[in-house]
Amino acid sequence: DLLFLMVGAVMLRTHADTIEELGGVGRKMPVTMFCFFVGALAAVGVPPTNGFTSKWIIYQALMAEGQPLLALISLIGSVITLAYLARFMHAVFLGQPGRNLDHIEEAPLVMRAPMLLMAGMVIVTGVFPGLLLAPLNDALAEYGMPSLDVAFYGLATGPGAWNATAVAVLMLVAFGGAGLGLRFLLT
């Protein structure tokens, strides 16, 4: 799992045993911090990651089966996940340095490469969910199980549809525009 690889990279480079010993590591390990951020977004279920697609399917299935309370409990679980991962992100990567960071370096390539590959796959399969869902659908159909209405760019389930590619493009435009606007305002 992406988050476990990231924790291993931080432990290798810092030799820290507790979160309290860390802080500000993101300045020295930006690739590791980026990979953690992508993994955290997926765990919480934020578009355009594959975590959102997974949670979308679960929420839609629960709603279709008349289980809105279970859908709400699942959503609350995602909010709790957001809280502890945000705390971890701040404590390890963004907070005040817990000690001297001069000796800390980015994770070695042998650790960075799998993290970057996994982070890339989290985003690619989130933007194009049909890459994984179409073969899964075929397997479900072989066993007579209900399948999803899947396209390369998204899916339709029960009362809703999800076009992951369109949402990813809109998010890119929105965040890119906001970043340019902020840069313009600050200069």
Regions found by a protein language model. Name each.
Residues 111-187:
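Membrane-interface and transmembrane segments of multi-pass membrane proteins
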Residues 44, 82, 92, 96, ...:
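Phosphate/oxyanion-binding loops and surfaces in catalytic or ligand/nucleic-acid-binding neighborhoods
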Residues 8-78, 88, 99-124:
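Interfacial and helix-entry/exit segments of alpha-helical transmembrane bundles
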Residues 1, 5, 9, 13, ...:
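Membrane-spanning helices that line or support transport/gating and their immediate boundary helices
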Residues 1, 17, 102-105, 138, ...:
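Acidic-enriched, low-complexity/disordered segments with a strong bias for Aspartate over Glutamate
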Residues 1-4, 65-105, 171-187:
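Predominantly late transmembrane helices and immediately cytosolic-facing juxtamembrane segments
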Residues 18, 22-25, 59, 93, ...:
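Hydrophobic alpha-helical segments of integral membrane proteins
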